């Protein structure tokens, strides 16, 4: 009768809710144990998929993809909207190899056809490195979103590295290189790391 049908429907509903809860719990548990989470949001998925890629194919990257990376860099937040960033796209083989030889953590430049040097204008802002760091992150995410691999290699605040980058990009005195980002098509498949750590989160007070 109708009462029995209602009881069955309620039981099925409770069962379905329980199963969904178990699936959700399992997904959260696996993510916390090392698996990168998958969401229904393309922007979040791209953030979680980003990884540092240090080996590249000897393959040309389309100009359109490079343009999107640079546009993404310029879409970064900037204090007082000053936008003190400058970008140098390096494709010269001699410059790439020379920087690879002189910079301690940029040896992958020998494999890369391209690198973007993210710079800041110290005459425009004392906090240029903050804005330029946001720009660099956007560039890395744009590379990931387009099937490219990239890695952040630091120049600032190391004077010896800054001097090397200045030498091969001919930067004027007011322009300081923050980082060099080699990029290209990844030579091998690489899985992103799961970096979420709940212990790093504090509420109201540390």
Regions found by a protein language model. Name each.
Residues 7-11, 15, 23-206:
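Acidic, surface-exposed loops and disordered segments
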Residues 1-6:
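Short, Lys/Arg-enriched N-terminal segments with co-localized hydrophobic residues
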């Amino acid at each position: 009768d109708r009462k029995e049908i209602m009881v069955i429907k309620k039981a099925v509903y409770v069962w379905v809710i329980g199963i969904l809860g178990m699936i959700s719990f399992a997904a959260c548990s696996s993510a916390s144990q090392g698996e990168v989470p998958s969401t229904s949001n393309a922007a979040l998925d791209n953030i979680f998929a980003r990884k540092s890629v240090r080996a590249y194919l000897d393959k040309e990257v389309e100009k359109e993809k490079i343009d999107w990376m640079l546009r993404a860099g310029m879409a970064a937040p900037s204090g007082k909207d000053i936008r003190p960033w400058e970008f140098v796209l390096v494709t010269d083989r001699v410059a790439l190899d020379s920087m690879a030889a002189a910079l301690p953590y940029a040896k992958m430049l020998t494999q890369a056809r391209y690198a973007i040097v993210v710079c800041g204008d110290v005459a425009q802002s004392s906090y240029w490195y903050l804005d330029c760091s946001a720009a660099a992150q956007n560039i890395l995410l744009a590379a990931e979103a387009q099937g490219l691999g990239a890695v952040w290699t630091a120049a600032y605040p190391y004077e010896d590295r800054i001097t090397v980058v200045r030498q091969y990009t001919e930067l004027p005195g007011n322009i300081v290189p923050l980082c060099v980002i080699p990029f290209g098509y990844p030579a091998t498949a690489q899985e992103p790391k799961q970096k979420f750590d709940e212990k790093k989160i504090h509420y109201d007070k540390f």
